[in-house]
Amino acid sequence: MDSPESSDRGLNPMTPDHGGHNGKVVHYFGQGVEGGPASPRKLGHGHLHPKANTALLLLRLLTFAFSLASLVIMATNSATTTATAGRHRTVNWVDFDTYRYVLAACAIVCLYSFAEIGLGLWYLLKGRMVMPESMAHWFDFGHDQGFAYLIFSACSGATAVAHNLRERHILIHGMYGCDEANSFCMKAEISIGLAFGAFLFIALSSLLSGYRLVKWLILGP
């Protein structure tokens, strides 16, 4: 006669003891049971949730769009002063070091964001990274941080120059202010504002890439 213990094991096929008798390891949530519900696929410790990966890709797209728009506006920023004495001179973005700095920073961030968009699409479509995982995490976070500081410093310096031009503390060619070159000043200010937008989005990207890096360092791949 079977003992109550063995009888209980026979009535409860989900216990580990039953799995040991028939040679099949059965887990409590039905994993490994034929016809049982499939367990959800677990994410690797060093990976973000799919929604977070999509959000990161969206931030890359916004960074690219804002930095490209700022780059184009600054690169085409040229105007002719309107002086009452009849002396007209052309003012260009290359006349100011800080504006050249903004253009260079936006160009670098634009190219970097474009490359990151390609890498992000590859990961979403293929499910794997182009570079080794450890290198990819450090690459993304390091460049996000570095380029965020780069474009922020460029915008900060250019904002001071734009303000001083408006207040006539700095004169264009030593004699003109924004009253005589209003279109030039306005385009420069718009370009700086868009560059600040690019900084905001790449800074948010660095938060996600930093979280992914810390998660990978603590929990492993």
Swiss-Prot record:
Residues 1-21 are annotated as: Disordered. It holds the Pfam family CASP_dom. Residues 1-54, 123-144, 211-221 are cytoplasmic. One of its GO terms (cellular component) is plasma membrane. It is found in: Cell membrane. Keywords: Cell membrane, Membrane, Transmembrane, Transmembrane helix. InterPro entries: CASP/CASPL, CASP_dom. It is a multi-pass membrane protein. The chain crosses the membrane at residues 55-75, 102-122, 145-165, 190-210. Residues 76-101, 166-189 are extracellular. Homodimer and heterodimers. Belongs to the Casparian strip membrane proteins (CASP) family. This is CASP-like protein 4C1.
